[in-house]
Structure formats: structure tokens, C-alpha cells
């Protein structure tokens, strides 16, 4: 079981708590983080990944790749701290709250949840909110 976090930016983030939260979400959804890599980066890297792998030439908050199926998750996700910062100011949520929301969102993608379509998006948001409410105890 391996969960690795990498911060490619100069910004300080709560890596230990992020690791606990990501692991908690994956396990609470009935999965095991066999090999999971979380990369916290800037706009330039996530835009390049978005362009090369998804054909979208813009920065986004997160991109998730799942490499297998079954209960043991092998995958990775990228989170743009630049987009997190912009969105936290735009939605007046605070940087850390937005960071944890997107990390939870990414973990849910690894667990197989999709957010394409209104109903799926609403279901994912409900799960995100539930896990966000658990943050103080994690």
C-alpha cells in the first residue's frame, strides 16, 4: 500500500493531513490505495498534462488517471495550486478548504465516481461535503 504526495511548488501545504484525508476517502469508499501518487503543482504543468492527455489547452483544478480496475487502486492525480488559489478567492472559501475539496474530489475520481452530468455532479458534491465535514477529526 503506497500513497505518495509530491509538491512541485514553493507553496507550503499540509501534506500529512492531505495524505490522511486522501487515504480515508479511498478506504471509506471500499478501496485500497495500492499505488496512488498525488502531485500538487502549478498551472503550467497541469495545463501541459491537460493538453497532452485530454486535448484541452487550459489549466484546470485536477486531472485524475486510474490505471486499473478492482478494489486496489493504482492511479495518480494532479492538482493545480494556482487554480485552487484563484477558486478559493473567487468562491470565498479559503485556500485550505478548497485544497481539501479538490483532493477529496480527486480521490473520489480514483474510486470510480464521475462528475459528467448534473446528477453525477450533484452526487459527487454530496460526497465531497460529507468528507469535508469529517476534516476536523482526521
Curated annotation (Swiss-Prot):
InterPro entries: MetalPrtase_cat_dom_sf_prd, YbeY, YbeY_CS. Binds 1 zinc ion. GO terms for cellular component: cytoplasm. It holds the Pfam family YbeY. It comes from the Bacteria. Its EC number is 3.1.-.-. Disulfide bonds: none annotated. This is Endoribonuclease YbeY. It comes from Chlorobium phaeobacteroides (strain BS1). The gene is ybeY.
